[in-house]
Every structure is written in structure tokens, then in C-alpha cells.
Amino acid sequence: MESAAVNAPDSFCFYVMINIENISISFGNLTLFRGLDLQVHYGEGVCICGGSGSGKSSLLKAVLGFVPLSEGTIKVDGTLLAPRTADHIRKKIAWIPQELALPSEWVSEMVRMPFELKANREAGFSKERLMDYFVSLGLEEKLYDKRVNEVSGGQRQRIMLAVTALLDKPLLVVDEPTSALDPESCLRVINFFKSLCSKGMTILSVSHDKQFAAGCDKVFTL
């Protein structure tokens, strides 16, 4: 894995949020990668890049405990990822997959659904904070009262980023956060993530978007 420090944050913290040591992931006879090492520090925004089939999304899912390791270890916030600790670790993580399932008919219902989960009830829903995030991401407040099918793919993507940030988890893991966005909206996401990181959130993402990757603190290429 190649790494490059792109924009080291001013308040760089040397405490490690994600520590990946010598991991290998295989599916049958297919080995995605072997002997991979990666550290993500508190308050960093880190992007994983690589070609299709390089294992980017599988690496994110391994951090979440959804994909088993063939070798090596992963620690999240100092806790070794294992079957008995996976649920505890996931409570610290906000996760946005590339394919978003939006079952609600109304945006106003959709944005409240994550807060009904037992693991997220302590966060508490705040429409005022959500609207602040909407503005930061270039979203009009009137979208809150729209039907989900009236909202574009790029708007849905940014709405979910705003809602997930509102959960106040220490770690955000997101797959292709700007895949449906134009350059202007991508820049808003970059600045939004920088703001979250400056407040102590750690962000691990996967992206093919060179503009987005260039705005991250570190880029790792598989």
C-alpha cells in the first residue's frame, strides 16, 4: 500500500483510532491483499484509493467487522476487533455504504430513522443542527419537507452525510461519499469533513474522486 500525506491537520493527534496490522483478506482462491498495514489517527480524514477490485470496500467492511480476516489484526479505538467485540466497536462508528437504502417516503421521516435505533438514541435528533449541516453542504432547507423520490441522487447523498454527522460518532466510515456530486458539491463535502475532523471526528473513506482524495489529510492507494 502506498501512502501520501496530503494536508496534515494543524492539530495533528498521534493517538491511533484505527490500527491495521499485517492483514490479509481472501475470498476462496482470490486474495485481495496480503500483509497490509494502515494507521488512522484521531481527527484525520483518510481516503483509500485504488482500481476496481483492489479491495477498497472490503477493507472498510473489515474495519466494521463485516468481512473476516485471513491474517492479521484490526484495532479500533484501542479495542481488538473480534466476534465478541464487534458490536461494541460498531457503536462507535457511523457507516454510510455506497448503495443507500432509503425506505421512507418523506425526507423528514428518513432523517429521523437513525435516531430511533437503540445504539443512537443518546445522540438525540436536532433539526436546528441538521439545517446547519444542510447549509454547509449546499442543501436547501425546504428539502426537509420533500418526498424522497423528489430528491436527486446527489442531494440524497449529502442529506445522509448530514444525518450521519449528527449522530456524533467518533468514527465515520463512508464508501464513495461524492460519487453523485459535481465539483462544487464535492468541495462542500471536503470542507464539511474538514470541519468534522477539526472537532475530533475521524473519517475513513473510499473514493475514485481525485478532487475529494486531494482534500483529505492522507491518501492510501491499494
Regions found by a protein language model. Give the residues of each.
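Conserved structural motif at the start of ABC-family nucleotide-binding domains
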Residues: 18, 33-35
